[in-house]
Regions:
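Histidine-/acidic-rich catalytic cores in large beta-rich domains
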Residues: 2-13, 29-33, 37, 41-472
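Solvent-exposed serine/threonine-rich low-complexity stretches and specific carbohydrate-binding patches
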Residues: 18-29
């Protein structure tokens, strides 16, 4: 026997477009246990194991077959359809669908779908005594160590698992004074950023609990809270009630308690980029100082007006219509954030985010089909001149059938430069039924190079990623 590595190949079904799953493990021991991922359900899978020496030379190989069972879960989509695919133009990888199950209190069920619409990986927590009824409103993110991290909104924990679903860390956030909400990410130091509620925080009456208006930084190895940002000291907490007058009984409606509804946080250089469903997109520094805010100018108190960026037309000229600036009217070449999610920095310094279109122009008239649409938007921000210009969008042309009032997200795809636009609920699908979509768009041509329909399904986020972590 010699030291060496194992290369795994899970062969694709004949006639399929998804490439074989290939992965070389880093372990060089004489005895190795390897996780085999990417098996088709209800199929006699063909697997090849290649044994190499330390120089990468093949020493032997084995061909195996492994019969799998049918997936049985009421939480999976009624049907998965690939309605469009230009496989040579797509970003490589699987689509990680972060589904909450059948509702917010159900057991979440993340799964990966390949380019042919086949489920190739699933994390079935329903069979776990530890994680049954886990609520991954945050969705799984892949950490720098190759594991997954998520926030559990049902039990208010921060959970780290490996690719086989084994628990690595399970941090009780209630013990730390927080409940989980909607988004987590990892900074360049490896710390976790999370949008949370603080259990001891009250609104001005000293009675009602504030929700969804804190951001924390946590050491994922020690569970130590390293920093806390209170949005009340950063944004205008008196700016609420403009939209949801008829939804005051809804726990997710805008109110004195849920005035911000923060739902996205990422590191951006030495600063941070965040979204709040009801307040827009904002950039802040480590000390909690607001650098700027992208939001309709209506209803902000005077002391915040200097933080608001001024909108430009596509040609770079200022928008001067006071109704457009205030947000009570929309112009053809600029959209304010309405019910926004998941702002992410782009390599060119711009911002890509998901604009749900919820409460556009401060109205909640879902019968106004002309004004009901969802889109992914790219902004160019000029921090010197304090302006914001919309340079790209996709989704408005799809109309009301593409509208999703909540959840959802976007992703910049690094290899191709494509964008993943992900309306996670309430879409009218090609057969007339409701569900969710995953749309991959080439921003240079506006071509849809891939679109997936998930019938009778919802999700929080979708991410295109490799099945195995690339750095492990």
């Amino acid at each position: 026997p010699v030291l060496g590595r194992i290369k795994l190949i899970v062969h694709s079904k004949p006639g399929k477009h998804t490439p074989d799953v290939e992965y070389t493990f880093k372990d060089v021991g004489l005895k190795q246990n390897i996780p085999v991922l990417g098996l088709y359900p209800n199929y006699n899978n063909q697997i090849t194991l290649i044994y190499t020496d330390l120089q990468g030379n093949e020493r032997a190989r084995s061909n195996l077959k492994l019969q799998t069972k049918t997936l049985e879960s009421r939480r999976l989509p009624k049907e998965i359809r690939v309605v469009k695919a230009q496989y040579d133009r797509m970003e490589p990888g699987m689509n990680l669908v972060n589904s909450p199950g059948q509702d917010e209190t159900d057991t979440s069920i993340p799964y990966m779908i390949d380019a042919d619409g086949e489920i190739r990986w699933i994390l079935d927590w329903e069979k776990s005594d530890e994680h049954r009824y886990i609520g991954i409103g945050c969705g799984l993110i892949r950490m720098q160590n190759g594991h997954y991290m998520t926030g559990d909104g049902n039990h208010h924990r921060m959970v780290e698992v490996d690719m086989m679903g084994n628990t690595i860390h399970n941090w009780d956030m209630l013990e730390r004074g927080y409940t989980m909400h909607h988004a987590i990410s990892q900074d360049k130091q490896g710390n976790i950023l999370a949008t949370v509620s603080k259990t001891s925080a009250k609104i001005a009456n000293g009675k009602d609990v504030r929700i969804n208006d804190f951001i924390i930084m946590m050491d994922p190895e020690k569970g130590e809270i390293l920093q806390e940002w209170d949005l009340v000291h950063m944004l205008d907490s008196a700016r609420y009630g403009m939209t949801d007058y008829d939804l005051t009984s809804d726990p997710f409606a805008q109110s004195a308690s849920n005035w911000a509804h923060n739902n996205g946080i990422v590191e951006w250089g030495d600063d941070y980029l965040a979204t709040a469903r009801y307040q827009g997109i904002f950039k802040f520094n480590k000390a909690g100082g607001i650098e700027w805010i992208i939001s309709p100018h209506g209803y902000w108190r005077d002391k915040y007006l200097k933080l608001l960026l001024n909108p430009l037309h596509a040609d770079g000229t200022p928008i001067t219509d006071p109704e457009v600036i205030a947000g009570t009217k929309t112009c053809d070449d600029f959209e304010w954030p309405w019910g926004c999610h998941t702002a992410v920095p782009l390599p060119n310094g711009h911002i890509l985010y998901f604009n749900n279109g919820y409460g556009r122009n401060f109205k909640l008239d879902f019968t106004d089909r002309k004004n009901i649409y969802t889109c992914g938007i790219e902004y160019e921000v000029d921090e010197v001149n304090r302006t914001v210009r919309q340079v790209w969008q996709y989704g408005k042309e799809r109309g009301a059938a593409y509208f999703t009032p909540a959840r959802s997200g976007v992703q910049y795809l690094e290899q191709t430069g494509n964008r993943l636009i992900c309306p996670g609920m309430s879409n009218v699908l090609s057969n007339g039924n409701r569900g969710a979509r995953v749309t991959e768009v080439d921003p240079e041509t506006q071509d849809v190079v891939f679109e997936l329909e998930l019938e009778d399904a919802i999700y929080q986020r979708v991410y295109r990623m490799s099945l195995y972590p690339e750095n492990q």
